[in-house]
Amino acid sequence: RDVERSRGLGDVYKRQGTNCEYDTAHAFARAGADPEVLVIRNLTPADVTASCEALVKAINESQIVMLPGGFSGGDEPDGSAKFITAFFRNGAVKEATNKLLKVREGLMCGICNGFQAIVKLGLVPFGEIIDTDENCPTLTFNKIGRHQSRIVHTRIASNKSPWLAKTSVGDVYNVAISHGEGRFIANDSVLASLVENGQIATQYVDLSGNATMDINFNPNGSS
């Protein structure tokens, strides 16, 4: 669909242990959006309730929701992602999020654990929060079994997403990565559907621009 050129209203979700929320908000502001950094509090049950209500209000008033990365809970397996998904599975928050994406044609994006949460909520690849099961894609431990931090080469495989509207298929970008659970896995039928729908946005590639499973270029062993 065409992307509106109006001034966007962005909601950047913040919780304990987050990083990159302020530079993300700065990037949105530079692009012409009006970002708000929303702090999620969970010290008391009343704080949790108030934070859910504030999140619903912010989503309803925004065109974009951005989930930054972080190391909540010491970044234990699924640590930060579990914290994020718990909030977004709240009934009112889930309803507001699905309405943003399916009715109001809003956008979501996630960095690091934020993207991990988006996958575990079913937002990628299904476009709405669902009750996921063992057949759904997930992000898990790097195949090498440890954290990876390096520069990788990524090729644009599809520019159907509004986030990639100004790129061209075949463009290669050098991207800094740093993660321990960045391996995207999905069953064959889901992968085939992603290919058919143009939902594989980027691929790790070698120096010749070819998609590869070589650990020297594909740092986590993603499918």
Task: Give residue ranges: language-model regions.
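Glycine-rich phosphate/diphosphate-binding loop of Rossmann-like nucleotide-binding domains
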Residues: 11-26
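Amide-donor transfer/coupling interface in amidating biosynthetic enzymes
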Residues: 29, 34, 50, 54-57, ...
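Conserved structural-core and active-site-/substrate-pathway-adjacent residues in large, well-folded domains
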Residues: 10, 84, 112-113, 154, ...
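Short helix/loop capping segments that flank catalytic or ligand/cofactor-binding pockets
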Residues: 20-23, 75-76, 118-120, 164-165, ...
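Structured core elements
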Residues: 11-14, 37-39, 66, 109-110, ...
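Single conserved hydrophobic/aromatic residue that forms the stacking wall/gate
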Residues: 2-9, 13
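Flexible gly/pro-rich beta->alpha loop and the following alpha-helix that scaffold active-site loops
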Residues: 27-31, 35-109, 115-129, 133-134
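Short, glycine-/Ser/Thr-/acidic-enriched flexible segments
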Residues: 15-18, 42, 71-72, 180-182, ...
